[in-house]
Amino acid sequence: MFMVALSLLLLRLSTASPCTSEACSGPYRISKYKMPTIDVSNHKTHVTVWKGPKEVTGILGYRSRYTAYCYEGGVLDGNTGCTKWHVMFPPSAAELQKWAIDGKCYYGVECNKGGDCWGSWADRCHDDRVDLNSAQEKEYNGNNDEWRMFAHHTCISTWRCGFSKSSYPIHFTNVKKGRGDGDITYTLATYDQHGSILSLDKPSVKIDQETTLSFELPRSLVSRSSTEIDCFFGNDQTPVCQLNEHFEDLEGQFVTFNGDYTATYGNYLLALNDKKAINGSVGAKKFGNKAWVEKQLGKAASLEDVRNILSIQMWSHQESGYNLVQLYKVVGEMMNTLTTVINSVGKLDDELIGRLIGVEGKSKWFNSELFHMCPCFQLGSFGDSNCASGYIFSEGRVKVDKDGSKCTSFGGSITPLYLFDNVSYKFAVLHTPPAQGVAQDWEGWSWLAAEKQRLIETMTFQDSVSGGNNVLSQLYKETLDSFNIWKWFERFSTLAAWGALAISVINMMRK
């Protein structure tokens, strides 16, 4: 009798819920969240720093000479003619220093066309002294000109010279790392107008046949120190780091290290000492830099500028990877914690796991980890009532409703309650560093280019106008000939010579 009563009770309890235990699936286990693998770490790292001068003062100077040594003896004299030449006299380093102090350039003998340099004074064309005259700037006076005087030697000697004092940015080059952390060799250098490296090993360098550049080097060129900088490691990339206040106006800039863990930025050379974190401490990231200015427009970007931009991109890439790892870490911890809570609460609320995975079912636990999922019938929506499809929601459970006497509903408005507030996100704005520009845009090289262009334009006019066959060249020659007394004398003397020859032939025939 007792067994029959117990069987009836169990049958009633089984029909009290809309779920059945006859077609369960499983077993299942709630697994922990698996973190994705991203090899990025952010640490404070020891670095040795070599600092050179930010700029070095350079004196750029040029000097050359045009000479025309002529003799006119008539058409029958084999010595008649002109010898013309251009000779380059690039100033020495000592001369450039004197030019800068005196504020003027020095040059040699100046003999103008139609002046006093004829006869015995024509030998002044062979005077190669370079310190007889001075001027703030000197250009040729009669470039490619000739001057002839009958039965005399003549000389045209004219010079061009000038100088400019400018500042040239300094950088480290030829960096080679030795066996020790501090064993590094390097060279200080700047760039010429073509972007080629100019080493500062020598106080002066010859730019071309006419031009010399002399540097005013300070006594102490390089200082050495150490600091700690914030770096990203990983992703099969060499470290990318952000410079701190130790680097003065470069604070906040980014630099990418090479395979030897060395890097250069402007007048700084950096070498990582240990390649790893300092006690695993996480670095603090900065995004603002008061020293950054807007990029100068209208100038070409140098390779150095492009490299700096790439370093910013590398930092942004590594930073994104690192931040993603940190986000994954937090999310993973939350998900694992939530998994533990669900695993525990699911043993009390057998419908919890079914609702979380979006199915109508209840959990039937086999032990502390394994369980089966048993299907439940769909009852539809309860809406604002506590009853649906013959079942009632009571004391947190869905049960069979026998008579519906306890069913009720809310007729008024329902106030929503939000458990989570909206979160506003902030993202850093990366600034581009000030562009250095290509070397040919620097003040000193642009000045030299302008001076060379003036010389080219002068010589091009002389060659194209005086040496061509166009209308302009003919007018040019006729204009010069109309004011050339010797040309008129030469024409008449030639005519007289031919007349004397004809008379001599006639007299011989008569005899």
From Swiss-Prot:
Keyword check for Transmembrane helix, yes or no. yes
Decide whether keyword rRNA processing is in the record. no
Looking up Gene3D superfamilies in the UniProt record yields: 6.10.250.3010
Which Gene Ontology cellular component terms are annotated?
membrane; viral envelope; virion membrane
Q: Pfam families, from UniProt?
A: Baculo_gp64
Sequence intervals crossing the membrane: 488-505
Glycan attachment residues as annotated in the record: 279, 422
Positions in the Cytoplasmic compartment: 506-511
Q: Which residues face the membrane's Extracellular side?
A: 17-487
Source superkingdom: Viruses
Query: Where is it localised?
Result: Virion membrane
Query: Where is the secretion signal located?
Result: 1-16
Q: What is its main location?
A: virion
Which BP terms from GO are recorded? symbiont-mediated perturbation of host process
List the keywords (alphabetical).
Answer: Glycoprotein, Membrane, Signal, Transmembrane, Transmembrane helix, Virion
Task: Give the function comment from the record.
Answer: Attaches the virus to host cellular receptor and later induces fusion of virion with host membrane.
Protein name listed in UniProt: Envelope glycoprotein
Q: What organism is recorded for this protein?
A: Quaranfil virus (isolate QrfV/Tick/Afghanistan/EG_T_377/1968) (QRFV)
